[in-house]
């Protein structure tokens, strides 16, 4: 427990307390749990009792397929090695040539994934383009309880589920392309999906854009270095 005292005239007290409470409520590591007021010699003294809670924060990166999320997340994890823990998602999607089990994803078949859903093994899961994606509860909740900041790269449905479950711990960040034409170009450049799949991804992107208002930060990935620097600034501001 920590106690903070503010002693001021009535006129200044309201503004002081308002600013302090706003600052406290913006940081999950500090929770206002009680207060009392003492009136003495025409001054008002307010004593705030604060409980320190060292839970980690959950940084959720999402955005349409092909926007560059994975490359940005890897760069952020490399830069913030001591401050971020990456939670590896599970998926039923087919493994790409460049991907490795247990590093990029935990690859599951449909029956295995659905059994994990029945066991309540995920903090979030969603079906995206006919494939399941989910974040395993075991590693995620252990990191949060230990005070470790968690980085998730997940689909927008999952992002909203995490926000609903951990409203005071979550920072939602949406990565968007500069244009649909550029997104199409990037999807084709990957050269690992047919035209039908690419078309579905573009349609899905339009649906995702409708959810942007649910995200605290929206970052346009036009130039990688500029986007990365913007994300670094966002994370640094949230760490403080």
From Swiss-Prot:
Record-linked Pfam families: Guanylate_kin
Keyword Ion transport annotated: no
Residues reported to bind ATP: 63-70
PANTHER family in UniProt: GUANYLATE KINASE, GUANYLATE KINASE-RELATED
Main location: cytoplasm
Cell location: Cytoplasm
InterPro entries given in the database record: ClpA/B, GK/Ca_channel_bsu, Guanylate_kin-like_dom, Guanylate_kinase, Guanylate_kinase_CS, P-loop_NTPase
Gene Ontology terms: cellular component: cytosol
Reactions catalysed: GMP + ATP = GDP + ADP
Coiled coil stretches, renumbered: none
Matching HAMAP family: Guanylate_kinase
Its job: Essential for recycling GMP and indirectly, cGMP.
Keyword Nuclease (UniProt): no
Domain Guanylate kinase-like: 56-236
Descriptive protein name: Guanylate kinase
EC number(s) per entry: 2.7.4.8
UniProt record similarity statement: Belongs to the guanylate kinase family.
């Amino acid at each position: 427990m920590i106690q903070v005292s503010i002693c001021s005239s009535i006129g200044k007290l309201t503004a002081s307390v308002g600013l302090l409470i706003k600052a406290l409520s913006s940081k999950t590591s500090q929770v206002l749990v009680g207060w009392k007021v003492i009136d003495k010699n025409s001054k008002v003294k307010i004593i705030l009792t604060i409980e320190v809670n060292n839970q980690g924060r959950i940084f959720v990166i999402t955005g349409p397929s092909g926007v560059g999320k994975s490359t940005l997340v890897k760069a952020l994890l490399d830069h913030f090695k001591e401050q971020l823990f990456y939670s590896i998602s599970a998926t039923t999607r087919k493994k790409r040539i460049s991907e490795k089990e247990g590093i990029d994803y935990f690859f599951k078949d449909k029956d295995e994934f659905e059994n994990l859903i029945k066991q309540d093994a995920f903090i979030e899961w969603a079906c995206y383009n006919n494939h399941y994606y989910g974040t395993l509860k075991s590693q995620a909740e252990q990191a949060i309880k230990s005070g470790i900041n968690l980085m998730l790269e997940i689909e927008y449905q999952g992002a909203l589920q995490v926000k609903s479950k951990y409203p005071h711990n979550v920072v939602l960040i949406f990565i968007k392309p500069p244009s649909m034409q550029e997104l199409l170009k990037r999807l084709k450049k990957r050269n690992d999906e047919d035209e039908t799949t690419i078309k579905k991804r573009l349609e899905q992107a339009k649906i995702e854009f409708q959810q942007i208002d649910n995200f605290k930060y929206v970052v346009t990935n036009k130039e990688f270095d500029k986007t990365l620097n913007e994300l670094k600034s966002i994370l640094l501001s949230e760490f403080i």
